[in-house]
Amino acid sequence: MCGIFAYMNYRVPRTRKEIFETLIKGLQRLEYRGYDSAGVAIDGNNHEVKERHIQLVKKRGKVKALDEELYKQDSMDLKVEFETHFGIAHTRWATHGVPSAVNSHPQRSDKGNEFVVIHNGIITNYKDLRKFLESKGYEFESETDTETIAKLIKYVFDNRETEDITFSTLVERVIQQLEGAFALVFKSVHYPGEAVATRRGSPLLIGVRSKYKLSTEQIPILYRTCTLENVKNICKTRMKRLDSSACLHAVGDKAVEFFFASDASAIIEHTNRVIFLEDDDIAAVADGKLSIHRVKRSASDDPSRAIQTLQMELQQIMKGNFSAFMQKEIFEQPESVFNTMRGRVNFETNTVLLGGLKDHLKEIRRCRRLIVIGCGTSYHAAVATRQVLEELTELPVMVELASDFLDRNTPVFRDDVCFFISQSGETADTLLALRYCKDRGALTVGVTNTVGSSISRETDCGVHINAGPEIGVASTKAYTSQFISLVMFGLMMSEDRISLQNRRQEIIRGLRSLPELIKEVLSLEEKIHDLALELYTQRSLLVMGRGYNYATCLEGALKIKEITYMHSEGILAGELKHGPLALIDKQMPVIMVIMKDPCFAKCQNALQQVTARQGRPIILCSKDDTESSKFAYKTIELPHTVDCLQGILSVIPLQLLSFHLAVLRGYDVDFPRNLAKSVTVE
């Protein structure tokens, strides 16, 4: 649950100050992944010192605190220039060990900083490895699993059979001992100007920038088997044989820069040319040449890694005129929902085509059951669309929380189609559920917002929601785009159902009008801010609804609790008499979502029960709903759309309310405590 960033300049002169600025800016782009501590490792010597040395600077708190700490280092000359240099940086969200400078990354192999490493993920067998290393005399400073990796590579180096063992060989041996998930980047005094990076289960990509022509667009994958017995004869020989055709470099050994990161948002301002590493890839840069190798070959392996061109633009990841990324992303929803539909929904012919699914559509139509799996907000998007998916596909639809799905060892069959929803495409529980379903022969479909993510690569087919980068930890625009993506899937499945044509056309007309209706809802921000002024001192809040808007209540309550730290509960109105009614009194704030849909009369019954107990309901209702407003303490009137899409409009006031509540309570909206954007650990 961390952010990795590293920068290598080869034959590109950079001052230490410029290197610091590049590393810090990269971390700031990744701060949404974790922000309880941060650190960097750079070359510490100032040319007049012959002995190589790595300088570590680590600080508890956000990246800004680290930035301030860097300029307090009297021992480092910020003006000294490096023609070739490799620096690594890390922003952390604690999984092992409390937030502190000693537990932050980079972690070191020893007090001499011979090897340093940054890590995103969890090593599940670190206790066994630590016990072994302690028995060999290695002393530990931190409580982290990552320090075990740093000590382990030092152990492998100390026990090397040959003096000229390569850096990548050391890393290869280390990862063969690791269990769990990791993305790792290593730096060492023994290999100046070299970098090694590897991943298994956690995302990692490499950006490349050069004003000169690059040697290749396809980096061939090299294979070898390194064992204690044959390392001298095989590994050493093969690495020496590497020629320029097996590596990526600037033609003529010219200047080139490499950027390593957990996420493309940290790289895009430097370059849009990237290589996505796959599980168990080992990428090594030496003398300005990037090579990629793997220990074992399998039939499904691609023979190379292609350089891909990212379409993301820098301004997409900046706040603009908004005070927080979350606020910006709420107001981007007219554009993001349009982008989700663009090129997919033909409003003239009333047809829908999801290009990522078209080759598998016949197989999907033959399935017996749909299983939709997600966590948090992604799960709520599945709940929100379950009813319309059942209606349009005429199939049973199971909606599952990924962790519970795995805990139950849920039966999955070859004629099931399983959807995996994740904004980042890296959510650990969802990824494990994907692998569980693949092992049982089900067809797997990814619904993600991140090209090249683990879920998008490992599923059989998928839908890119195309919502644009979402930086705020609390998901907003990704939710509405996930919602629409699933509705579009239902529309595509029902295209040949004559009995459903009127319903399909109604929904497609509703999709067409959504961007303008969302703008209308966003114009209510001032009214919602006034409501927040009344509520921000409260300690608890109930959000109640049913039918299509039950998911709205769950999602709204989640937004409120995760960024305002108020207790908030989404309640199915049909369950009111089975317990929650006991909470209702004149002090308890209650938000009710009551729309003109098939559940309207039943919601009126719930409203009567709330007011009979002296409740003072705040009602989200349709503009023409005079009946509900008679019993409301306050109303927020929303434009009306087709019932199955109403949840997109009704969730936005709750997103805005949670934002303003958090601001009024004095909390950091984009970085709520104890949470991170991309949940890459179980």
Swiss-Prot record:
The active site is at 2 (for gatase activity). The modification Phosphoserine is found at residue 244. PROSITE patterns: GATASE_TYPE_2 (PS51278), SIS (PS51464). It catalyses: D-fructose 6-phosphate + L-glutamine = D-glucosamine 6-phosphate + L-glutamate. CDD domains: GFAT (cd00714), SIS_GlmS_GlmD_1 (cd05008), SIS_GlmS_GlmD_2 (cd05009). Pathway: Nucleotide-sugar biosynthesis; UDP-N-acetyl-alpha-D-glucosamine biosynthesis; alpha-D-glucosamine 6-phosphate from D-fructose 6-phosphate: step 1/1. It holds the Pfam family GATase_6. Highest levels of expression in heart, placenta, and spinal cord. It is an enzyme of class 2 (transferase). Its EC number is 2.6.1.16. Residues 2-288 form the Glutamine amidotransferase type-2 domain. Substrate binds at residues 377-378, 422-424, 427, 578. GO terms for molecular function: carbohydrate derivative binding; glutamine-fructose-6-phosphate transaminase (isomerizing) activity. GO terms for cellular component: cytosol. Residues 360-499, 531-672 form the SIS domain. Keywords: Aminotransferase, Glutamine amidotransferase, Phosphoprotein, Repeat, Transferase. One of its GO terms (biological process) is protein N-linked glycosylation. InterPro entries: GATase_2_dom, GFAT, GFAT_N, GlmS/AgaS_SIS, GlmS/FrlB_SIS, Ntn_hydrolases_N, SIS_dom, SIS_dom_sf. Controls the flux of glucose into the hexosamine pathway. Most likely involved in regulating the availability of precursors for N- and O-linked glycosylation of proteins. This is Glutamine--fructose-6-phosphate aminotransferase [isomerizing] 2. It comes from Homo sapiens (Human).
